[in-house]
Amino acid sequence: MNAPSQERLFDLTRDDDQRMNQDTMQRFATNEIRAVAKDADEAGATPEGFYDKTAELGLSLLPIPEALGGAGMARYPVSNALNAEDLAWGDLALTLGAVTPQAFVNTLLDQGSDAQREQYLPRFCEGTFVAATTALMEPRATFDPMEPQCTATAVANGYSLSGSKCMVPLGESAELVLVIAQLEDQGPAAFIVEGTPEGMTRTREDHMGLRTLELATLAFDNVQLPDDALLGDGSFDLQRFVDLSRLGLCALAVGCCQGVLDYVKEYVNERVAFGEPISNRQAVAFMVADMAIELEAMRLMTWRAASLAEQGLD
């Protein structure tokens, strides 16, 4: 899929690499995600070994430099969105858990220091799943992602972190958490929290359809962090982080909705009433058609946003 230019029209045809990835992702979504999604949701837990299987797809290691053990490939928001869409067709919660470490990796590549990249990124290149996540949302009705109320204060030898984050994916077990907080007298900043330091608590959250995601509320009560926990030099570009996060969620939503539409089409063609499939009823057919129209609009808006992000445009 190509970005628009003055020389050619906007091209929505997937390139060879994207088509190859599509085959891989759709096969994985069918055989490894959808096949276990229902039982996993009812059990409220991810199947054993599932995330290590997703690690074999290499989604997190692809953009990591070769010097750190990765593939050293360029990052393409369009391709990332396509991959997320194809996987989410299988199940939204399992896919979101699988791709959550990508946000951590990409943010480190974007805004981390060389020392932080060298310290953390090689872990993602060992062939096993690394539970890494980002913590942005906060438990209040008026939450504004650009104005976090979780605070960080400079103290001797580091920072003191206080506040709460909610709906953190993989929050129950994540070994690395990128916490967005308001740095005193500076503005929004990001901090890398390893493990569960003193003063940090994790509380599981259960939400319909997301029970396998290990969502949790993370509370920080004067958690002491070292100096090098501050991401980069402290000048965190929160708007870029939020924009790319929203783009990823949009792609996941498109894939999930495509899965719903495919299910509905099969159902209305198989369900028989008064001697014929209910899809023959115009009222039903119109509803399904409206779903397809809205879904295609969602997809095209997401692809356009990904294309703009790939060009560095707003």
Where do the PLM segments sit?
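Intrinsic disorder at enzyme termini
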Residues: 1-17
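Glycine-rich beta->alpha junctions and the first turn(s) of the following alpha-helix
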Residues: 10-14, 21, 202-297
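Internal helix-loop-helix
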Residues: 56-129, 169-176, 309
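A short, Trp-centered hydrophobic/proline-enriched beta-strand micro-motif
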Residues: 127-137
